[in-house]
């Protein structure tokens, strides 16, 4: 999956991934292989994407959160060590290919100590296949551009965030 490698390399060169941060990943493996979101799913594609992200994690120290599909209310699979009980609520569900999606399922099975949380608020994310990760990204979302527009057949959208600017005409920001 050369597009994914190129995408991740470009993001690393832009310092997109930071140690001790969480990046949410949404992915439709169906879309990657050219099918309608939620229709087919591919554990092979999920494995390739997960393994590529694991390499990034090892290189940069970033953690990844894997958004499930709408059938589990887009709940997010994370490592227990990333869980913050003050800002996250654990839920009882195990992602499955048909209720959670292939990537969240693969991640749950291959993470060290996975848990699923209802919602997170993280500074950045990568959406492969228009899975609607925006609900998990801090305000204010800012698009990130790379040369890679698709992974396989899936459209890729990347976002980071910035603090809100408040105050009005008298406020100073710099």
UniProtKB/Swiss-Prot annotation:
Pfam families: DUF436. Gene3D superfamilies: Hypothetical protein TT1679. InterPro entries: Antibiotic_NAT-like, DUF436. SUPFAM superfamilies: TTHA0583/YokD-like (SSF110710). Belongs to the UPF0340 family. NCBIfam families: TIGR01440 family protein. This is UPF0340 protein SH0921. It comes from Staphylococcus haemolyticus (strain JCSC1435).
């Amino acid at each position: 999956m050369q597009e994914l490698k190129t995408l991740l390399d470009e993001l690393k060169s832009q310092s997109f991934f930071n140690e001790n941060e969480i990046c949410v990943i949404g992915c439709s493996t169906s879309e990657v292989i050219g099918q309608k979101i939620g229709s087919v799913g591919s554990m092979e594609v999920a494995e390739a994407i997960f393994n590529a992200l694991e390499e990034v994690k090892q290189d940069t120290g970033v953690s990844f959160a894997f958004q499930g599909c709408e059938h589990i209310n887009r709940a997010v699979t994370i490592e227990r060590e990333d869980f913050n009980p003050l800002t996250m609520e654990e839920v009882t569900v195990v992602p499955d290919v048909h209720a959670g999606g292939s990537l969240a399922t693969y991640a749950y099975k291959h993470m060290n100590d996975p848990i699923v949380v209802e919602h997170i608020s993280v500074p950045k994310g990568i959406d492969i296949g228009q899975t609607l990760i925006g609900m998990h990204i801090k305000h204010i979302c800012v698009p990130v551009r790379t040369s890679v527009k698709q992974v396989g057949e899936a459209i890729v959208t990347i976002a980071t965030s910035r603090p809100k600017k408040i105050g009005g005409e008298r406020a100073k920001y710099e």
